[in-house]
């Protein structure tokens, strides 16, 4: 097996889907994650994903690897990164991984990992790599469950935020994972929402969901010019 060691970054793991992150590599990463979790007395890992085309398969490969160690998996489906972090406090499990390419090009994907409500450090990322290289895996048969944390996430925000007046806002979800929740959150806060590209689509047919690039903001700028909203909100994948 060829393992591109450059996928192991300072605080996450990322590379090109189906090349750097192929079935064998991702399954081994799952075995490494499950084994490391069990060594810390963590018996359950939450797994989430973004809307990228490669994410469902990568989720299957990763889950398979984790389950093969005896560690359990809780699948929470397509969520934003903040929703994933919320789940580690809301659910019984305080650890997990979200499969996301963030703002990187569509062919990329990656993993953000949390153990006991703490994001992994660079040293912990290297520990996962060493487990793969040394084949230091536990064996067992974990259990797969599913959970929906959308309602609890929305309720948490609504209880924490109070607006002085109803706002007219424009949101560009860029066909990313934000589309599963953004409009509903702001409507429950009392806002009038104009939503662009709220349907999650990993091909990103309208523009790439990276608001740091001016060209990805043009549709939102046009929307504001027409609607005169109080606030504009671009989102990442």
Where are these regions (language model features)?
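Short glycine-aspartate micro-motif
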Residues: 94-98, 170, 231
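An N-terminal, well-structured beta->alpha segment
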Residues: 1-64, 68-69, 149-167
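Ferredoxin-reductase
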Residues: 40-116
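Conserved strand-to-helix beginnings and helix N-cap segments that scaffold or border functional pockets
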Residues: 56-60, 125, 183, 232
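Short, glycine/acidic-enriched loop or turn micro-motifs at the edges of active sites
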Residues: 15, 53, 106, 175, ...
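Conserved small/polar residues in nucleotide/adenosyl-binding loops
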Residues: 229-237
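Active-site flanking residues adjacent to catalytic metal/cofactor-binding acidic residues
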Residues: 11, 49, 100, 171-174
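Gly/Ser/Thr-enriched, mixed-charge loops and adjacent short helices
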Residues: 109-227
């Amino acid at each position: 097996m060829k393992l591109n060691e450059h996928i192991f970054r300072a605080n996450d793991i990322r590379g090109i889907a189906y090349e750097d992150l192929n079935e064998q590599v991702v399954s081994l990463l799952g075995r490494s994650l499950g084994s490391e979790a069990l060594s810390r007395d963590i018996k359950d890992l939450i797994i989430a994903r973004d809307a990228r085309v490669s994410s469902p398969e990568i989720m299957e490969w990763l889950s398979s690897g984790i389950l093969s160690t005896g560690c359990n998996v809780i699948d929470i489906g397509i969520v934003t990164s903040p929703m994933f972090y919320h789940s580690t406090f809301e659910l019984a499990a305080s650890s997990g991984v979200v499969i996301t390419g963030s703002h990187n090009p569509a062919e990329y994907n990656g993993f953000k990992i949390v153990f006991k409500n703490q994001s992994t450090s660079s040293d912990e990322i290297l520990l996962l790599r060493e487990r793969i290289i040394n084949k230091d895996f536990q064996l067992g048969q974990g259990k797969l469950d599913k959970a929906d944390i959308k309602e609890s996430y929305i309720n948490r925000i609504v209880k924490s935020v109070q607006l002085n007046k109803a706002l007219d806002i424009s949101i560009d979800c860029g066909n990313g994972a934000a589309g599963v929740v953004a409009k509903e959150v702001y409507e429950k806060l009392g806002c009038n929402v104009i939503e662009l590209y709220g349907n999650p689509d990993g091909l990103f047919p309208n523009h790439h969901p990276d608001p740091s690039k001016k060209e990805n903001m043009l549709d939102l700028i046009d929307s504001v010019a027409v609607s005169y909203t109080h606030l504009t909100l671009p989102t990442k994948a």
